[in-house]
Amino acid sequence: MRIFKKAVFVIMISFLIATVNVNTAHAAIDVSAKSAIIIDGASGRVLYAKDEHQKRRIASITKIMTAVLAIESGKMDQTVTVSANAVRTEGSAIYLTEGQKVKLKDLVYGLMLRSGNDAAVAIAEHVGGSLDGFVYMMNQKAEQLGMKNTRFQNPHGLDDHENHYSTAYDMAILTKYAMKLKDYQKISGTKIYKAETMESVWKNKNKLLTMLYPYSTGGKTGYTKLAKRTLVSTASKDGIDLIAVTINDPNDWDDHMKMFNYVFEHYQTYLIAKKGDIPKLKGTFYESKAFIKRDITYLLTEEEKENVKINTTLLKPKKAWEKDASKIPDIVGHMEIMFNDATIAKVPIYYENERHQKPKKQFFETFKSIFLNAAGGAKWSI
């Protein structure tokens, strides 16, 4: 077939889906925070932002990183001996005493629910070996996550260091990562906790979770005299997971609910590419054989049209493949999803064989499909 005379061929399919109008979101959402952001927890797409890259003091939302490192240390069931240094830490506390023996898990709950600064230091000393060692781990993790405008100097966020700062954007990145950890999800979303190794019962300070917002799934509060009110919160509704961050915001509860409600009202998750067979390959070598292993979804508004494209690139089939299927590579191409001329997803295309089986067909879909209702035929570029 002439269509295979080049090394690759590209199938480009355009869909009638809407364009994100960021200006519309900015006009509809007005927050009092100095910095703010709300992102899709699945894709990381920024849905609204205000000075999101401005470096600012962040107060106790610092403790999200402290919790992440404690959880990932694998030491949650270990017993921590509380130091005098931890006990002397000023500010909010869970009232530890010197020499007290507490399970690390209890300290992390006290850190997240009651914002215990003493717990933060006890965690840091146990997990990092010392405060300096733990701070090094915090900054190393921040670098790994791409938090380019963040610098940690302590595990709690107190104003004792000039160069302790982050941004709304970076804290959203951190929280997106943290929410992938089951222990973090559970702790962050706990309303009341009874400590296992202390005579304490703690209620979460996050009023969105405990009182104000039915779709809240967790978060972390913060306040210092210099940072003012800071807040990270998460919410879920109808399969949409959101992350909101505000820094220096006197009306943070209201602003978070305002951002959440706007997104839940105007956005929905669309199925852009369905796992399994790739349409528009009829009459080709790859018909009924080329497939992707996962659904590709994206959060979009109803108004967004014509700005999502799928570029499917496949290897040119060789004559030897027709004679001996074992010579066909496992991965024969890739599917690239473009939105507003930017790549939002790129997944490998597999050729069905004994090692790679197509996903089973699903009879029910949870997402609104735009892939199956594509307008027009395929455009071939050779």
UniProtKB/Swiss-Prot annotation:
**GO cellular component annotations of the record:** membrane
Q: What does this protein do?
A: Removes C-terminal D-alanyl residues from sugar-peptide cell wall precursors. Required specifically for the synthesis of the spore form of peptidoglycan (cortex).
Q: Where is the signal peptide?
A: 1-27
Active site (UniProt): S60 (acyl-ester intermediate), K63 (proton acceptor), S115
Q: Which organism is it from?
A: Bacillus subtilis (strain 168)
**Location in the cell:** Forespore outer membrane
Q: How does it sit in the membrane?
A: Peripheral membrane protein
Disulphide bridges: none
According to the UniProt record, activity depends on pH as follows: Optimum pH is 7-8.5.
Instruction: Please give the name of this protein.
Output: D-alanyl-D-alanine carboxypeptidase DacB
An example GO biological process term is: sporulation resulting in formation of a cellular spore
Query: Which key words tag this protein in UniProt?
Result: Carboxypeptidase, Cell shape, Cell wall biogenesis/degradation, Hydrolase, Membrane, Peptidoglycan synthesis, Protease, Signal, Sporulation
Q: Does the keyword Hydrolase apply?
A: yes
What are the top taxonomic ranks of the organism?
Answer: Bacteria, Bacillati, Bacillota, Bacilli, Bacillales
Q: Which reaction does it catalyse?
A: Preferential cleavage: (Ac)2-L-Lys-D-Ala-|-D-Ala. Also transpeptidation of peptidyl-alanyl moieties that are N-acyl substituents of D-alanine
Q: What family classification does the UniProt entry report for this protein?
A: Belongs to the peptidase S11 family.
Which residues of this UniProt protein bind substrate?
K220
Question: Which superkingdom heads the taxonomic lineage of this protein's source?
Answer: Bacteria
GO molecular function annotations of the record:
serine-type D-Ala-D-Ala carboxypeptidase activity
Q: What is its EC number?
A: 3.4.16.4
Q: Which InterPro entries match?
A: Beta-lactam/transpept-like, Peptidase_S11, Peptidase_S11_C, Peptidase_S11_N
List the pathway annotation.
Cell wall biogenesis; peptidoglycan biosynthesis
Q: What top-tier enzyme class does this entry carry?
A: hydrolase
